[in-house]
Amino acid sequence: MNFSQLLAAVRGGEASVIVPASWAQGRASFGGLMAALLFEAMRQKVVDGRPARSLAITFVGPAAPEVPITFEVEVLRDGKAVSTLLGRALQNGEVVTLMQGSFGAGRESVV
């Protein structure tokens, strides 16, 4: 699978995604790819297409290639202007990547 196909699988709500070995270095899938996939899962839960304003990513453990990865997204708060979400990428029931994000609507400003 190429990058677009992996994102499309997450966007399409696949139960799990398998990252091919070509997207790995050693025993772990590339961190940037894991961040992108988890971000895409989180974006699906954001109201009104609010853009990301901040992200904090923790690579908890290596995401092994060729092993199914599932994504869980929890909406911590949906406020009037900002949504705060927590995303988890899991393999074999263990968290491999954790992401907290704030997605906020723009504000009018004269600055």
Question: How does the language model describe each region?
Answer:
Residues M1-V111:
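Terminal targeting signals and extreme-terminal segments of soluble enzymes
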